[in-house]
Amino acid sequence: MLTNQELTAKVKEISLTYFKQSFDHEAKWNQRLRTTGGRFFPKDLHLDFNPKMAELKDFEGVILHELTHYHLYRSKRGYKHRDADFKRLLSQVGGLRYAPSVIDKKIKYYYSCQNCGQLYPRQRKIDTKKYRCGKCRGKLILKTSGN
């Protein structure tokens, strides 16, 4: 994994390549990030990144996403996810709109519908008397348990 200095250098390089503007602040790893790819801090303009994202091939897209926040904020334009400026610039540079999932879900139970055969992978057990198939309203049965 890259050090914080190497990460900052990579972010600066990507900023010049895609935005033709310099990144003049710090980029660092944040171990506490679980589901997000990164965070932009308007208060001091630094970027935090999830270290689990570093191994993904889409990591450059996560960096582009955070740099989009950074450059729009510095140019006093809409830098939030809902703003048209953000959506437009993000699509122009090819950044990711959403962070890829790094959480590996442990599927323990597989339910299937008796009527249509629709399969429902689940992490937790469900009450088959209470829940039905969302497709045809058929009865659900437990196929296999991963225990």
Curated annotation (Swiss-Prot):
Binding annotation for Zn(2+): H65, H69
* The protein's required cofactors: Zn(2+)
* Gene Ontology MF annotations: zinc ion binding
Give the InterPro entries listed for this entry: SprT-like_domain, SprT_Zn_ribbon, Uncharacterised_SprT-like
Instruction: Provide the active-site residues from the annotation.
Output: E66
- What GO biological process term is on the record, naming one? response to stress
Cofactor notes: Binds 1 zinc ion.
Ranges for domain SprT-like:
9-142
Per the record, the similarity remark reads:
Belongs to the SprT family.
Q: What is this protein called?
A: Protein SprT-like
- Organism, by scientific name, is Lactococcus lactis subsp. lactis (strain IL1403) (Streptococcus lactis)
- The gene is yciD
